[in-house]
């Protein structure tokens, strides 16, 4: 049973409540052009039980990984209670959610009361739209193997891209349902959605004071799957209808770059696979490699944009071609060695300038550019910079003679 079930706060839907949800299921199926294979189990929980369910899904290993990576990069305060922060953000006033692990659609008690009571209020309409979004997740699970897809190991970059498909699909379907109720076809709106995505009001899905107060890296990675994902899926759907969206689940974008620039998804522009080589001197000094990741264009934009008003430097990150970040630890110290590559020397220069502007004024930090590659180092004793620079230089020279990954002609089917 779910954690909420264990504390006795969950109950099955009544026949009347089931009828209300069934109506929303039919709406989701119609707009998304998919049908459920079997009825979705519905449970009603109060707000505190839902918050507790979501809090219980936070893995301690994920918290420590976030602390290790983003703390070392200066994007999170390593002293913060990250568990409390994530729990607060995730537990804020959730209308309902679909759990692919258990196949349950969980709806908040007071929301359900509103849906079966006086209809027509603004909150009730918002709740209906959000539940259509969640029912689309059930369709994804039953028809497009969402549950299996969630289990795959991915880099942060690939995970941001995967979640953009999942949430962008459900958000576009939700908007399509809202438009349909006003007699407006989705085709009339997909281009506008791509252009206005950042200004759309998605309050029912992503909102809350705790989210507003969260560090930029947390806020961006939680909101981007909805907003950037919506823009991406609008481009895919506008090009090939809902069958193309189904295909995006089967062949998801490989990077956040492909989400942020859908043309790069359509041409399947590959990123550069980068493997940071350990410097023997760093290991001999007692540092151990404890984490590695590819953060991609989305998260590099946050890193490079720490001094900007928005907190993200989309322009500086837009020439991204590949990256790998390695975190080293020695006792209580952590250090970051980050190799990045860019489409052109000019893109690398722009990234280099942005990286230098946010680099700590400390002897343990360094930023260097060679051709279209940029090295970022944080937290590493200055005497170890030269061997790290030497390893990076070999990599930079190796790709110097190579152009960035070529674009591949678009496939006619997506």
Model-inferred region functions:
Residues 24, 141-147, 151-199:
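Post-HExxH zinc-binding segment in Zn-dependent metallohydrolases
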Residues 37-58, 153-157, 187-198, 251-254:
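Acidic helix-start/capping segments at beta-turn-to-alpha-helix junctions
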Residues 19-114:
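Auxiliary, metal-adjacent structural segments of Zn-dependent hydrolase domains
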Residues 205-333:
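Pan-zinc metallopeptidase signature
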Residues 2-12, 38, 103, 109-117, ...:
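Acidic/histidine-rich, surface-exposed loop or edge segments in extracytoplasmic proteins
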Residues 316, 321-414:
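C-terminal soluble interaction/assembly domains
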Residues 28, 129-146, 170-171, 233, ...:
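Active-site recognition of the HExxH zinc-binding catalytic motif
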Residues 109-132, 155-162:
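Short pre-active-site segment immediately N-terminal to the catalytic Zn-binding motif
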